[in-house]
């Protein structure tokens, strides 16, 4: 749709680029895996290139945002007789090519596959948990970041954040499935695997799992309200959903390790 402001792309690239860089550093210090680290460095480099290109072409804005700004300014002028200055864009500057943002996740996919293969036996289970977990945590994190962007771009339609919330809800059962896949969290809950805390971590995981989908559902319901404050309320709920989603994923990984 090309309607989210170009600054949101900067937010995404900086946030996930730093995460990737941190992952590479930790991997090199703790348990180096050559393919994983090499492609992790590639992710950081590709993210940096996309960020630089986006900054160089910032005056172009994005097509959908330009159209919306012009429409709103025209409407205000017609209703009030006041010719309000719209945000100015330079049409002579080429837009940022969105395809450039695909390189980092493609390189990241290779790094994740390498990480999954190295994680242990069975390989298929490790790969599934690694890839599904990355998609799930990425979706909920992206949704929370986008919720904050509505403060910067208040005229933005709700379709983008609703789409991300929907993706989080869609991915939740798959995340649950791969964490239950034997040997999984059912073994922790039954006591076959000792979590070291008398079963408390297992029930904490259950609480995090249930709370995550409830918070995502509450976020979706909140976004049906017409008031603009509903977006801010949804962002607050997504804050909590991130905490419980990471609890759902990381507690299971730590316990099953």
Model-based region annotation:
Residues 1-154, 160-180, 198-257:
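Polytopic transmembrane helical bundles with strong interfacial aromatic enrichment
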């Amino acid at each position: 749709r090309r309607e989210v402001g170009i600054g949101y792309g900067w937010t995404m690239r900086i946030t996930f680029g730093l995460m990737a860089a941190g992952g590479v550093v930790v991997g090199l210090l703790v348990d180096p895996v050559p393919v994983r680290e090499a492609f992790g460095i590639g992710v950081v480099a590709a993210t940096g290139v996309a960020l630089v290109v986006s900054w160089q072409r910032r005056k172009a804005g994005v097509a959908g945002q330009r159209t919306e700004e012009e429409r709103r300014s025209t409407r205000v002028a017609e209703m009030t007789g006041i010719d309000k200055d719209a945000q100015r864009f330079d049409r002579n500057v080429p837009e940022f090519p969105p395809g450039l943002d695909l390189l980092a996740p493609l390189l990241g996919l290779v790094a994740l596959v390498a990480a999954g293969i190295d994680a242990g036996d069975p390989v298929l289970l490790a790969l599934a948990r690694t890839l599904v977990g990355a998609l799930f945590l990425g979706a909920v994190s992206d949704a929370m970041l986008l919720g904050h962007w509505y403060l910067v771009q208040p005229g933005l339609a709700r379709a983008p954040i609703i789409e991300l919330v929907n993706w989080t809800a869609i991915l939740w059962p798959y995340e649950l499935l791969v964490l239950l896949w034997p040997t999984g969290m059912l073994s922790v809950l039954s006591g076959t695997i000792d979590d070291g805390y008398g079963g408390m971590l297992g029930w904490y995981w259950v609480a995090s799992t249930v709370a995550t989908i409830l918070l995502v559902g509450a976020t979706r319901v909140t976004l049906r309200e017409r008031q603009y404050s509903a977006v801010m309320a949804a962002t607050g709920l997504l804050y909590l959903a991130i905490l419980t989603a990471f609890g759902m994923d990381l507690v299971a990984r730590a316990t099953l390790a």
